[in-house]
């Protein structure tokens, strides 16, 4: 009897968890479409800004913080985009693991990383381990707004533009999760500043190799001056990059949560079915034992009367 009561209790508690998991899955499913659309909508503007920066970097000989910054400065800034809530599988742990690998690699190169974290789970992780944070932000990781993107970009840009003797950094890195599709989300490390020239890969276009031929590049005119143009482009580039990464991370978080809750719901249902079979088997065994005892008692009485 005690075993049956324990099984009934486990079935009831597992059923409650199954309802919670299923509700979380449905909530995530209702958010994923908007999160995906925001991530897609941010790409055209970010790509346009990035193309403009690439054009400036590759077609001009410039000495500006956007491409070169304090080469002797060992300090670098690392921004990790984590989640506010759990129930998202290995989402935050994957970000933290990649961040730790990046920090170890940078320290191995003789650099001094300064860590910035967005998301309550990541902030709690580092606070619990008494790890210093240069700055942190919490709230709305599933639906990041313009305000948080502006706050993060201002803090990172301020750290990047400060002189060496005032604690400025020489590089900016972002660790985030790129949304590929509902099943695949990949953790990425992006060096945002200084900007690196990305060479276009034309191997898939089946065009002849013209690298040995003289290349005619467009003539650009900058008004009022090149430095003023770059000073205007730099904060917009940083803000757009961070905004895009926030949207990618939000879509990835929601997708991970939906997948994790779907798996948890299925596991809870399987466990309920298994426990129900055990309960039925226990009931059957109990009934069989009672019938055996009744039949045995009846046989004993019959023999006694004879």
Swiss-Prot record:
Subcellular location as annotated: Cell membrane
SUPFAM superfamilies assigned: ATP synthase (F1-ATPase), gamma subunit (SSF52943)
HAMAP family (UniProt xref): ATP_synth_gamma_bact
This protein's name: ATP synthase gamma chain
UniProt key word Membrane: yes
Protein encoded by which gene: atpG
Subunit organization: F-type ATPases have 2 components, CF(1) - the catalytic core - and CF(0) - the membrane proton channel. CF(1) has five subunits: alpha(3), beta(3), gamma(1), delta(1), epsilon(1). CF(0) has three main subunits: a, b and c.
Entries under InterPro entries matching the protein: ATP_synth_F1_ATPase_gsu (IPR035968), ATP_synth_F1_gsu (IPR000131)
Keywords in alphabetical order: ATP synthesis, Cell membrane, CF(1), Hydrogen ion transport, Ion transport, Membrane, Transport
Broad class of where this protein is predominantly found: membrane
GO annotation terms (biological process): proton motive force-driven plasma membrane ATP synthesis
Species classification: Bacteria, Bacillati, Actinomycetota, Actinomycetes, Bifidobacteriales
Family per similarity comment: Belongs to the ATPase gamma chain family.
Functional note: Produces ATP from ADP in the presence of a proton gradient across the membrane. The gamma chain is believed to be important in regulating ATPase activity and the flow of protons through the CF(0) complex.
Origin species: Bifidobacterium animalis subsp. lactis (strain AD011)
């Amino acid at each position: 009897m005690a075993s049956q009561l324990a099984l009934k209790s486990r079935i009831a508690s597992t059923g409650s968890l199954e309802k919670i998991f299923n509700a979380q899955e449905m909530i995530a499913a209702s958010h994923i479409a908007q999160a995906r659309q925001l991530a897609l909508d941010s790409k055209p503007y970010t790509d346009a800004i990035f193309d403009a920066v690439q054009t400036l970097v590759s077609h001009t000989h410039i000495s500006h913080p956007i491409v070169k910054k304090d080469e002797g400065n060992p300090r670098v800034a690392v921004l990790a985009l984590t989640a506010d809530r759990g129930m998202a599988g290995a989402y935050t742990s994957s970000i933290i693991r990649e961040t730790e690998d990046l920090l170890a690699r940078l320290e191995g190169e003789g650099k001094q990383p300064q860590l910035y974290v967005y998301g309550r789970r990541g902030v709690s992780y580092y606070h619990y381990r008494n790890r210093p944070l240069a700055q942190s932000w919490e709230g709305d990781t599933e639906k990041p707004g313009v305000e948080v993107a502006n706050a993060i970009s201002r803090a990172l840009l301020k750290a990047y533009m400060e002189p060496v003797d005032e604690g400025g950094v020489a590089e900016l890195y972002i660790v985030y999760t790129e949304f590929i599709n509902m099943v695949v989300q990949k953790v990425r490390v992006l060096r945002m500043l200084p900007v690196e020239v990305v060479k276009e890969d034309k191997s898939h276009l089946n065009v002849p190799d013209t690298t040995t031929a003289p290349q005619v590049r467009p003539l650009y005119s900058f008004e009022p001056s090149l430095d003023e143009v770059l000073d205007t482009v730099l904060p917009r580039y940083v803000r757009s990059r961070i905004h895009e990464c926030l949207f990618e991370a939000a879509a990835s978080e929601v997708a991970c949560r939906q997948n994790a809750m779907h798996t948890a719901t299925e596991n809870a249902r399987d466990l309920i079915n298994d426990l129900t079979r055990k309960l039925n088997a226990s009931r059957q065994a109990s009934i069989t034992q009672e019938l055996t005892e009744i039949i045995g008692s009846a046989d004993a009485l019959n023999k006694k009367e004879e």
